Amino acid sequence: MKRFFSLLLIFLTLSTLLFAQEDDEGFYEDDVYVYAPNGAGDQFLKITLGAIFPLNFKGQLSTGGKASIGYFRFLSEYLAVGGELSASYNVSIGEKVLVMLPFTFGAMFQPYIGRFEFPVYAEIGLANQTWQNMEIFPTFVTKLSAGAYFRITDSISIGASTDFFWIPQWFKDSSKNFNGLFESAEIGLRYHF
């Protein structure tokens, strides 16, 4: 009886091979993969260091320093939104220090060619300014930026950028209004994730 069940089990197992057939169509994959360095949902942190140049102070301020940290998230392959916090200083001819802390939000458009990326930013925000123990907050800030970065790996890119700041000061007495214009040149590191 045991032999009968063993032979029946072997016979039924091998009989399935009689009904097996080959797939003549072969393997076909419908998806096409195209490499793009950035896609919707990708993010990056950036850190920059550089110099800031006063443009319309007629020799009253010297070249200063600037550092910033920012976060951006891609909405598509080319468009991202995010914000940036900067800190800069300039020294006057009277050895007084102008300190500015702008916090901006905006959008970035970034075309690329191979591993080279060319971000262009437009941002607006508020700044805290300190000058001769006077603190001015909030001050309106607009910033336009452009740069060129090289993607070393999928996670790291390095490059250079320039920022143009317009920081107006408006008072009740309009004769005292002033438009502060600054340009910066920076080197930067970006971490993509």
Regions found by a protein language model. Name each.
Residues 14-20:
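C-terminal segment of classical bacterial N-terminal signal peptides
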Residues 4-14:
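Sec-dependent N-terminal signal peptides
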Residues 162-163:
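Internal, hydrophobic beta-strand segments that form the core of beta-sheet-rich folds
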Residues 20-75, 188-193:
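Short glycine/proline- and aromatic-enriched beta-strand/turn motifs that initiate or cap beta-hairpins
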Residues 184-186:
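Solenoidal tandem-repeat scaffolds enriched in leucines and small polar residues
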Residues 50-58, 88-94, 126-133, 166-173:
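Sequence/structural signature of outer-membrane beta-barrel proteins
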Residues 65-143, 150-156, 188-193:
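Gram-negative (and chloroplast) outer-membrane scaffold detector with strong preference
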